[in-house]
Amino acid sequence: NSNDPFTCTTVVTIDEAGGEIQVAANGIPNHDFTSTKGCCTNEEDYDWIFPITAVEDSDGSYESGPARGAVAVAVNGVPMFGPEDGPGGDAVALHHKYYHEDRQQIDLGICGGHSAGSTYHYHWDANCILWQPGDGEDISDYDWTKINSSIHSGIIGWSFDGYPIYGLYGWNEVADVVQVKSSYQLKASGQDGYDGTDDWEYIEGLGDLDECNGMFGPTPEYPDGIYHYVSTPISGSSNTHVDTDGSTVEMIGFPYFLMCYHGEATGGPKGGNSQPPPPGIVHPSGILAGIDSLSESWISQHIRQISGAILILIALAVGLLRKRQPET
């Protein structure tokens, strides 16, 4: 592992063909990052497929997202993973010292991301994608509590069913900006995250979101309303937890991105090390095109109307250099 930062390039390209959106990315985020214990992040060769028009699951039997592996893709082309890590525990609960890990030590780095082998991915948060540092700040100063709480958060990712994933702040029923919270909490009979998703229970009305970690409502991009998922650092549960240091802490916002697909998950990964992919992958035709560029400070968001049914947020990069923090 090097003690010296070095530069990486974030590259994302998109193409619309055959009723789908195809996104190609190298998996390098648009912010400084640490690989942590997994070591060491490499450029990948991802092809992600998304439906142009999201189709709601008609019978309500929502397909579960994979507990391990990609459930969505961030707007910078980095995969967003389910809650569990390699040993089968909740990676985010371990990061917050909810339990002792005696199988394989896992660390999460800046913005809730790390590498498993060569593949960099997020397990939670990812709000730093749209964070703008203050004077004298850099990514090492980032914390999700520094996200602007006075405005509705932007789109930070897209699920494989075509619905967007927003950052942690949204509108309530009277259009006030509030922190959106999940409706899950630890089971009293569970192992505090050691057994992964099995240690959590959904309680309707506990927070703001449904069992998939989403809700229907207006957003800046969809003023008439759309179903959307939310990145949830915190749960709506009033229960607290005593961590392994003996400190009493808030209930974290499992499942962090999404637990199940509200729509038909006909998208998914085509390449790279993002396994396991969800079922129903559709293979598109056409060539990659439509390259645009990122700003120096943070990803420029490009929103366009496609088929009058869904807005696709596109984060594209050409030649943007980013420093990588020393890997540990």
Feature roles, as predicted:
Residues 276-295:
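Juxtamembrane amphipathic/hinge helix adjacent to a transmembrane helix
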Residues 2-5, 25-30, 34, 88-101, ...:
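Surface-exposed intrinsically disordered loops and tails
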Residues 151, 156-268, 283:
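Extended, compositionally biased non-globular segments
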